[in-house]
Amino acid sequence: MELKHLPKYKHITEHAETYANIDAGSLELFLSLFDISKKMNHVMEHYFAGRGLSEGKFKILMLLFDAKDHRLSPTELAKRSNVTKATITGLLDGLARDGFVSRRHHTEDKRKISIELTTEGKARLEQFLPGHFSKISAVMENYSDEEKDMFVKMLGDLFERLSVFKD
């Protein structure tokens, strides 16, 4: 596989001679992963938009779909989806407008709110998921279970190691 706009291995190895601590193979892999992650984000953004969703909205719907009683607090949704409370509010406003979620005040403490997946939201997911999962399977069909397991482990390790970029 050759990704566009990435330095060729030959050029990377030439820089390795100029700069200390450059492992050409690591740099090529890192740049390839960086490029493919941008491409995946772009593809998925358009995919979800074409279906009246966004990645964020889809994530919220799935969290609620999997939750006990299809209900979670806005704070829990923000935490589980790794976004701010302000971002979750915007996502929930959009999902409520679409009729996919509703806000429910607790009976004992009216300040507490839970977000519930509506019947319409559940039906939308049940209609959407088979095709979505089929597309994911098509993307991954050339990989063995062992390769998938190894890749998931490697991505987890990579995720942890990205902390070296935090200042």
From Swiss-Prot:
Keyword Transcription belongs to the record: yes
Record key words, sorted: DNA-binding, Repressor, Transcription, Transcription regulation
Alphabetical list of SUPFAM superfamilies matching this protein: Winged helix' DNA-binding domain
Signal peptide: none
All residue ranges annotated as the HTH marR-type domain in the record: 26-160
DNA-binding region positions on the chain: 74-97
Entry superkingdom: Bacteria
GO-annotated molecular function: DNA binding; DNA-binding transcription factor activity
InterPro entries: HTH_MarR-typ, Tscrpt_reg_MarR-type_CS, WH-like_DNA-bd_sf, WH_DNA-bd_sf
Induction conditions: Partially autorepressed.
Quaternary structure note: Homodimer. The N- and C-terminal helices from both subunits stabilize YetL dimer via extensive intersubunit interactions.
Purpose: Negatively regulates yetM expression and its own expression. Binds specifically to corresponding single sites in the divergent yetL and yetM promoter regions, with higher affinity to the yetM region. Recognizes a 28-mer operator of double-stranded DNA that contains a palindromic sequence.
Protein known as: HTH-type transcriptional repressor YetL
